[in-house]
Amino acid sequence: MPTMIKISISEVTVYGELSDTLCGQAVAKVLPIDARANVWGDEFYFTIPLTMSLDETSTTSIKVGDIGFWPPGNALAIFFGPTPMSTGSDPVPASEVNLVGKIIGDATVLRKAKGTSRIRIEETMKRKESEARSERL
């Protein structure tokens, strides 16, 4: 079962989920994460206390809203738009990442948090309200 997460960066909060993969659940085990966020185009990335190798989910084919683990830097990456390596609107990581999760809803709102240095990711039982509302209908 995926792990629901809350991502807070400055005044911006989004919800997401970490997948049921080995790497996704390894990330879930190190929550909560408080880190200094780096920015690379429309991507936040930051080191977390986890060492993993590339796995069966590893790819450079990323979509807006994907969350990846980048083994060379022991870093988590949150993609919310094009990166410097992009040729279109999809993000492109510097090298392969393990897909470990995704943002629920509009990840592009994270653009409002650019210039902020701190990020917090924690487990939550709550889903983004609009998602919960659509499930009730």
Each language-model region and where it sits:
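Glycine-rich active-site loops that engage anionic ligands at enzyme catalytic sites
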Residues: 19-23, 30-128
